[in-house]
């Protein structure tokens, strides 16, 4: 009976924390105004289930309102997911992401490293607001480049070696 209780307790804990996101170290001195301008090509990510984040991201900054847009498909309809938000503490940015006016997810982006001109490494914690995954969280690391280059930059090789990044494509 004690074994059953312990196993049940471990199972409950595993389920309760399965949807938790990580809390990576944010980049010191991050400049949102330099980062949130122009296009970023997502070249690598850790999400094993889908490479849905492998898009071209269009970013902008309008007086502290940060926007990230990319191609999105829902129920066969293709359009644009528009994520808008503001900076919060510790170089984290929280967005509400909408498709055709419906909030699909809330995303917290942690900038981990960037040179602003070539590469960016960041972590996304996504909380799904609609669809079959509503209420669930998913976290993954993403590497983006200003050009569609498939190589991990030398400056990030040490930081990314244990992240199990997968090449998009």
From Swiss-Prot:
InterPro entries in UniProt: Calycin, Triabi/Procalin
Matching Pfam families: Triabin
Question: Keywords in UniProt for this one?
Answer: Allergen, Disulfide bond, Secreted, Signal
Cellular component, GO, one term: extracellular region
Question: What is this protein's tissue specificity according to the annotation?
Answer: Expressed in salivary glands.
Note the SS bond partners: 21-125, 54-168, 83-97
Which cellular compartments is it found in?
A: Secreted
**CDD domains assigned to the protein according to its UniProt record, in alphabetical order:** lipocalin_LTBP1-like
SUPFAM superfamilies per the UniProt record, alphabetical: Lipocalins
Name the major location: secreted
Q: One GO biological process from the UniProt record?
A: symbiont-mediated perturbation of host defenses
Task: Give a yes or no for keyword Zinc in this entry.
Answer: no
Which ranges does the record mark as transmembrane? none
**What protein family is recorded?**
Belongs to the calycin superfamily. Triabin family.
UniProt name for this protein: Procalin
């Amino acid at each position: 009976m004690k074994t059953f209780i312990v196993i049940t307790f471990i199972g409950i804990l595993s389920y309760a924390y399965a949807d938790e996101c990580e809390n990576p170290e944010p980049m010191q001195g991050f400049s949102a105004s330099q980062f949130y301008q122009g296009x970023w090509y997502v070249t690598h990510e850790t999400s094993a289930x889908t490479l849905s984040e492998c898009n071209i991201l269009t970013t902008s900054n309008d007086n502290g309102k940060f926007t990230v847009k990319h191609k999105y498909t829902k129920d066969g309809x293709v359009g644009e997911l528009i994520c808008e938000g503001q900076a919060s503490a510790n170089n984290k940015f929280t967005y509400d992401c909408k498709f055709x006016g419906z909030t699909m997810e809330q995303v917290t982006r942690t900038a981990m490293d960037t040179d602003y001109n070539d590469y960016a490494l960041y972590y996304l914690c996504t909380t799904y607001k609609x669809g079959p995954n509503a209420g669930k969280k998913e976290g993954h690391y993403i590497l983006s480049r200003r050009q569609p280059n498939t190589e991990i930059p030398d400056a990030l090789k040490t930081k990314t070696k244990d992240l199990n990044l997968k090449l998009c494509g």
